[in-house]
Amino acid sequence: YPLLPLSDLFAKAVHRAQHLHLVAAETTKDFERKYIPEEQRHSHKSSPSAFCQSETIPAPTGKEDAQQRSDRELLLYSLLLIQSWLNPIQNLSAFRTSDRVYDKLRDLEEGIFALMKTLEDGGSSQGFAWLKFSYERFDGNLSEEALMKNYGLLACFKKDMHKVETYLKVMNCKRFAESNCTV
């Protein structure tokens, strides 16, 4: 991320977050079609195993909540969510393009650091260091248990990338109040 105007940094970060969310959604859908019987798809989403680790952090849960938070908080939560997936994504064989997804996560992480630095935050995430966590690695086994675990992880990845996308869009809209600003 070379020295770009703040509006361009936000635009790039939002675009990358949207792309990652789309990839996560498509991968989850492909995984469902390939491995998960129709009747299990709906029951799994309400089961306790569908719980995502990110739900344990005090991050905003929706657009309205995100609008009440500072840019610093939203950037830190976005960074935390992205970093929690860096390790597990490397092992995701369901992504035929796991290298590219990992690279895109790293790129978005770098973009968020650039935003933090530009916003005079210095890129420090010290205030949230105690919140660090990482998801389990994806299981390469094709047993039913492993498939359901991977399905849950994919659902969490999709949900977390949607959160990052929402946080970045909210910040972009607050700062630049574009007429076509939708979150």
From Swiss-Prot:
PROSITE patterns: SOMATOTROPIN_1, SOMATOTROPIN_2. It is found in: Secreted. It comes from Prionace glauca (Blue shark). GO terms for cellular component: extracellular space. Residues 38-67 are annotated as: Disordered. This is Somatotropin. One of its GO terms (molecular function) is hormone activity. Keywords: Disulfide bond, Hormone, Metal-binding, Secreted, Zinc. InterPro entries: 4_helix_cytokine-like_core, Somatotropin, Somatotropin/Prolactin, Somatotropin_CS. Residues 46-56 have a biased composition (Polar residues). It holds the Pfam family Hormone_1. Disulfide bonds join C52-C156, C173-C181.
